[in-house]
Amino acid sequence: MFFVNQYIMTKQTDGTQKLTKAAYDRDTLYKAQAEFHRRQGNAMDASDTIWTLCMIIDEDGAVYASEKAVKPAEPETEA
């Protein structure tokens, strides 16, 4: 399980920027992770344990992601 805060950044008429909380979108999340890894020169694969904690998408579609490495939780077993 992981938590995601996703925001859309838009420019206002007065030149300021506004962040609006957006709906969770798994496909966009994974694309943001892959792009983050590409820019860092690292490959992203199924063994990654890095989850996006916050990402911002600007009006041009650019995605900014803040990431933190975490260990995945052990799967729960049913008794």
Please identify what each model-predicted range represents:
Residues 16-17, 25-51:
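A short, charged, amphipathic alpha-helix used as a generic interaction element across diverse proteins
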Residues 1-21, 50:
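Short aromatic-glycine-(Arg/Gly/Cys) micro-motifs in beta-strand/loop hairpins
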Residues 4-5, 9, 26, 38, ...:
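Intrinsically disordered, low-complexity regions enriched in small/polar residues
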Residues 21, 41-79:
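Short, mixed-charge low-complexity intrinsically disordered segments
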Residues 9-11, 27-29, 59-60:
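Generic structural motif
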